[in-house]
Amino acid sequence: MKLKKITFVLIVAIFAVSTAFAFQFSPFVEQTFSPTGADSTKSYTIVNDSDESIAIEMSTLIRDQDSKGNELNKSAANYFSIVPSKVIVKPQSTQIIRVQYKGPRTVTSELSFRLRAEQIDYSLGRQEQNQSMFNFLYVYTASVYVAPSKIVESVVVKQVTPGVNEDGEQVLNVTLANTGNVHQILTEAELTLLDNNGNRVILSGDKLPGIDGSNVLARKIITKTIPWPKELPYPETGSASYKAQITYSK
């Protein structure tokens, strides 16, 4: 499976107390750990290029998905060792963070996590007259995976059903199943639909909102709702049936 660029989520929270400073966190690609050996440990770098010390707290989260593909998280503290997990980074300096996987040594299906670098309030030595109304604190959230020894890549359409959304609009519910054992990013996805009357349509790009470019974690089944394709007659009764296939760039 080719290496894909990481998506870092930058969350800016506003707090009243003092002025805080942004930091840089790298690498900028998703990291895949091995359950054992040298690749069970990875290094990250925090760069503080400001003129003030900043405080950073590191943590890991289990990454899961609900039936709609929304991300769910809970602590993964038992899976990783992070050294240091809390650090004061001095002005114009860097700090190396070492993250080691400590979870199960036998992994048959990819494990998905988030690595979180969170700036926490740090006001030691600042004078009250230099304080401002807002404190901008930054959080970087990175993708982390623990790979199985053998990789199987496969996402299939489990079911498609017509429906009506809360606004009364005709929609198509598409249920996708990742039958492989690693996450799949549905880049350049194409969905081919065929109804029992022989009508056929191929959907891609902006006709697949929530599907094209989405990440389906290993062994997960998710349902996405998209607008009903105008090229396909909407069924007047519940007797319609559909065949569907999805392709994407791996």
Predicted regions and their residues:
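Short acidic, flexible loop segments centered on an aromatic residue
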Residues: 51-74, 181-200
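A charged, solvent-exposed segment within the mature domains of Sec-exported extracytoplasmic proteins
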Residues: 121-186, 197
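Bacterial N-terminal signal peptides that target proteins for export
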Residues: 1-10
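N-terminal signal peptide c-region/cleavage motif recognized by signal peptidases
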Residues: 17-19
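Hydrophobic beta-strand positions in extracellular immunoglobulin-like domains
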Residues: 46, 101, 117, 176-178, ...
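Beta-sheet-dominated interaction scaffolds and their linkers
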Residues: 22-50, 84-86, 154-179
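Terminal connector regions
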Residues: 102-151, 231-250
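Intrinsically disordered, low-complexity Pro/Gly/Ser/Thr-rich segments with frequent PxxP/GP/PP motifs
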Residues: 75-105, 200-233
